[in-house]
Amino acid sequence: MSLYFTTLFLLLTVEMVMLFIFVLPLPFRIRRGIFSTYNQLTAKQQIKTIIFITGCLVGLLFIDSWKRSQIRVSLYHNDNSGSIGSSAVTPIQALASRAYNQRNMYISGFILYFSICIPTVMSIVKRLVKYQGLINEQEKQKLNKPSSNSKKDSNEADSTKLQEELRKKQISLEGLQKQVKNLEKYFDEKNQPGNVAAAEASKKGN
């Protein structure tokens, strides 16, 4: 197994693992963390350059392997007549070379395919994270509304209690005012001149 084939197979495995993790139904926090890490990595110019160069090399390997796998294998036969007959066979080395090129073509093709699938899946994950964040904010607002309503109810209860106390104090104040008026009326009647003379005459008679 050559070095570049090992590298290609490792790259394909990494892409498959990444795509498998991205499509898993993960919790919101983990998915948001993965998306943030992916954005931070892909935003760097060095990472973009590495991805571009790797994509170009894999694309060239795919084209070369495809061309080599399409080459027709020459036929030969075992006799020395030099003519091609029904006993013609295909060389084992040519078949092995074709299989080797086809294998490289499939691996490089899948690498290119997954390199397109990963950004597409991440765009979907981006929308999922965005909408899930909006849903969570709406749920928090709904949870905060009852507390505000309870505060409003408590304020209304306090206001009602204060109004009731104020009404009672007004009633007691009105009662005191009536008592004061009655006392003033009583003293006014007692202090009139006729009433004073009658009171003095009754005292002298006694």
From Swiss-Prot:
Q: Where in the cell is it found?
A: Endoplasmic reticulum membrane
Q: Where is this cross-link: Glycyl lysine isopeptide (Lys-Gly) (interchain with G-Cter in ubiquitin)?
A: K190
Cytoplasmic membrane side = 29-45, 126-206
> Can you tell me where the transmembrane regions are?
8-28, 46-66, 105-125
The source's superkingdom equals Eukaryota
Question: What GO terms fall under cellular component here?
Answer: endoplasmic reticulum; endoplasmic reticulum membrane
Which ranges are annotated Basic and acidic residues under compositional bias?
Answer: 150-163
Record's keyword annotation contains Transport: yes
The misc remark on file is: Present with 7210 molecules/cell in log phase SD medium.
The protein here is known as Endoplasmic reticulum transmembrane protein 1
**Protein species of origin:** Saccharomyces cerevisiae (strain ATCC 204508 / S288c) (Baker's yeast)
Lineage start: Eukaryota, Fungi, Dikarya, Ascomycota, Saccharomycotina
